[in-house]
Amino acid sequence: MSFASEFKQFIAKGNAMDLAVGVIIGAAFSKIVASIVDDLIMPIVGAVFGGFDFSNLFIALGSVPEGVALTLAEVRKAGVPVLAYGNFVTVLLNFLILALIVFIIVRQINRLKRPAPGAAPAAPPEDIVLLREIRDALRQK
């Protein structure tokens, strides 16, 4: 089997197509989660903490030249190495929200997939019933 035909067979399988669709939807969904965090959650968190913006949190690893504003963009522009942990906090919130949403979706799908409560066992075939009756009649003699 040639490489091209093996590749076609692989792509034609449902699993590969499902994976491709999942990746595309996941990429689009991550933008929705990023918007939820950036546009809805972080402003509320900022309001609770007095207008605090997590994306500008940083620790300067060198001395900041005098006259440079103490914002992340300005300190980076001045060439000072920084630990920008505020962006990490935002990305971490994105991840936690995405993980929670995926967990809820998978949980609901698993609930839908659960088998129905056990059905009553099927009645034994008529010949088995007759054989049991004969056996019981012979035991009584």
Swiss-Prot record:
* Entry-linked InterPro entries: MS_channel (IPR001185), MSC/AndL (IPR037673), MscL_channel (IPR036019)
Q: How does it sit in the membrane?
A: Multi-pass membrane protein
User: Where located?
Assistant: Cell inner membrane
Which cysteine-cysteine pairs are annotated as disulfide bonds in the entry? none
Q: Name one GO molecular function term.
A: mechanosensitive monoatomic ion channel activity
Say yes or no: keyword Manganese present.
Answer: no
- Signal peptide bounds: none
Per UniProt, the keywords (alphabetical) are: Cell inner membrane, Cell membrane, Ion channel, Ion transport, Membrane, Transmembrane, Transmembrane helix, Transport
What this protein is called in its record is Large-conductance mechanosensitive channel
- Membrane-spanning ranges: 17-37, 40-60, 86-106
Can you cite an annotated GO cellular component? plasma membrane
What HAMAP family does this protein map onto?
MscL
Family annotation (Gene3D superfamilies)? Large-conductance mechanosensitive channel, MscL, domain 1
Subunit and partners? Homopentamer.
Q: What does this protein do?
A: Channel that opens in response to stretch forces in the membrane lipid bilayer. May participate in the regulation of osmotic pressure changes within the cell.
Q: Which family does it belong to?
A: Belongs to the MscL family.
